[in-house]
A protein has these predicted regions:
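ABC-type ATPase nucleotide-binding domains, specifically the catalytic core motifs of the NBD
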Residues: 17-19, 110-121, 132-134
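Short coil-to-helix segment of the ABC ATPase nucleotide-binding domain corresponding to the Q-loop/switch region
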Residues: 103-110
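Conserved ABC ATPase "signature" region
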Residues: 72-73, 121-138
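Conserved ABC ATPase signature
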Residues: 143-147, 151-153
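Catalytic Walker B motif of ABC-type/P-loop ATPase nucleotide-binding domains
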Residues: 168-171
Length: 224
């Protein structure tokens, strides 16, 4: 694709100091991600997949190297700037859903924008994306514990999309779902990608990875 990469890593390393010795989670990783790509990240347990995703999503900072988001270096930003960047540009989907148990489904979805958007508009936007996820209106007032796993993941995806992010990061998005429900979730992610979202997902499942157009493999913190 033409234009500036949405993500660029330059010799990025992440090292965790532990009493027993340093753990190198990522070792001099360089890569680029173009806008509109759909990428699967695969590798053995402990290979650095989640660390890579956390760095892509501004949830962590590298020990060494540089990370750029749409040409802007983010690897040395302040915590406040990283928080704003996550809020405005990035959506996250997690294996465990990470919904707030005491909030209703629609309140969970509008949560990322409630402080930056007036109440009426945040509710309208939340309902819009929930309907796009094929969630029945009757479920909007249900709390997460009253929803099935597939419904919870649809709510989680709606929450990730409510701020209309450029980049959607997914960590094992079908890991807690049965095959049929997982397929439905992957069709939703594929549709978001067709509508121009850049999607990067960590998965151990080759059938899930097959939805992506590129696969990045990590072994022992390095690109294989």
């Amino acid at each position: 694709m033409n234009g500036e990469p949405i993500l660029r890593f330059e010799d990025v390393s992440k090292i965790y100091p532990l009493p027993a010795g340093d753990v190198v989670a990522l070792d001099r990783v360089s890569l680029t991600v173009d806008p509109g790509e759909f990428i699967a990240v695969m590798g053995p347990s402990g290979s650095g997949k989640s660390t890579l995703l956390n760095l892509m999503g501004c949830l962590d900072v590298p020990t060494a190297g540089k990370i750029y988001l749409s040409g802007r270096e983010i690897s040395r930003m302040s915590d406040d700037d990283l928080t704003r960047l996550r809020r405005d540009r990035i959506g996250f989907v997690f294996q465990q859903f990470n919904l707030i148990p005491l909030l209703s489904a629609v309140e969970n979805v509008e949560f990322p924008i409630i402080l930056t958007t007036d109440r009426e508009e945040s509710r309208r936007r939340a309902i819009e994306v929930m309907r796009a996820m094929h969630l029945d209106d009757a479920l909007f007032t249900h709390r997460p514990g009253e929803l099935s796993g597939g419904e919870q993941q649809r709510v989680a995806i709606a929450r990730a999309l409510v701020n209309d992010p450029d980049l959607l990061l997914c960590d094992e998005p079908t890991g807690n779902l049965d095959t049929k429900t997982g397929t439905a979730i992957m069709e939703i992610l594929a549709e978001e990608n067709r509508e121009s979202k850049t999607v990067i997902m960590v998965t151990h499942d080759p059938n899930v990875a097959a939805y992506a157009r590129r696969t990045i493999r990590i072994v022992d913190g390095r690109l294989a």
